[in-house]
Amino acid sequence: MTVFFRRMAVVFLFISLLTLCCSCQTTPSSEVPTTDTPTTDTPTTDTPTTEVLVPNAASDFDYDIFEKDGERVIRLIRYKGERTDVVIPDSIEGLPVRILLGVTKQNENGYTGVVQGVFEGTAIESAYIPSSIRSFGLATFAHCTMLKQVEFAEGCGITSLSTSCFEDCTALTRIDLSPLTKLMGTYYAFRDCTSLEEVVLPEGMTIIDEGSFLNCSALKSLYLPDSLEKIVKNAFDGCIGLESISVGKNLRLYEPAASNVIFNSHALKSIIFRDGVESLDGYAMFSITSPVSVEVPASVNVVSGNTFFNYNTMTITFAGDCPKMESEKWLGDVIVRYNPDKMGWSNCDWSAKEGTLTLEPIK
């Protein structure tokens, strides 16, 4: 009997161990820690997704091979694809796409010129321009009235947008030109872009050409980069919605040959001259037809009444010492606000013509 119970005890122990092992192997997976697999609550901000841009096929374009500066390159002639979200390829047939030329034709005098831009008049809605592009032909995107978005790749070596490049792109609301650090030419580039509200100009740009933003009536604010030296007449004619302008330190205000003012907006409310500007000795730069606030940094040492054609009330606040007044008196009703702790204001003898001048210390 004792032997029997011993044998039964051994069997019972064996069965218990077997049951325990089986229960360990069948533990529900939901109870197993999942530290190697992130849950749905794990933030994904550390691994942002990047949209993959798929270039248009070469068959979407008429193009040719051209030798420029010892390099064989592709020139795009005309877009014939159906995609409305255009991604210009950076290479075709193993050669870099360098020039958005357009359709050319030789006239009776033997001169060959562009008669139709690459995308002119098409129904495209967006365009991505790769860094391989170096130049645009006439009216590249002109009259693309459905075009809403344009993106330039970083490192674009474009120096000129060509005449009427984006003319009459009436659906375009914003354009960021900051990647185009070598940009020089913008001749009538955005004429009649009547929905354009915001423009980001590149640091490195030195001139805004004639008619560049002609009739951009929805443009509300403008930040002029420090590199900008000159604005040619008519550049902002018809920008009747422009409310604020920030002026960089290198803009030359004096433009004696100008036949009209550079900024003439009835909506203008604020003009800010940024630190580093030394002279406000300009001619017909701003037409003041509504109450305007002007901020002048301490770096300014020369001012001129000719800079502002004031037909309303202008409040101009000086941060530094009283500058020297060159040429004409202030025009219209002017309120000058100044810091009484700065030099020269107690002896200020400024005056106004066709209006009143009020000196008002900042308390």
Can you say where each PLM-predicted feature lies in the sequence?
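Short, aromatic/basic amphipathic alpha-helical patches
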Residues: N260, S327-D333, M343-T356
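Structural signature of tandem-repeat unit edges
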Residues: I65-E71, G81-I99, N107-S135, T145-S160, ...
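Consensus positions within tandem repeat domains that build extended binding/scaffold surfaces
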Residues: G137-T140, S162-C165, Y187-A189, D209-S212, ...
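Short, low-complexity, disordered segments immediately C-terminal to signal peptides
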Residues: Q25-L53
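C-terminal capping region of solenoid repeat domains
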Residues: D41, D46, N347-K363
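Bacterial N-terminal signal peptides that target proteins for export
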Residues: M1-F12
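C-terminal motif of bacterial Sec signal peptides marking the signal peptidase cleavage site
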Residues: L20-S23
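Short beta-strand/loop segment at the start of cytosolic alpha/beta domains
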Residues: L53-Y79
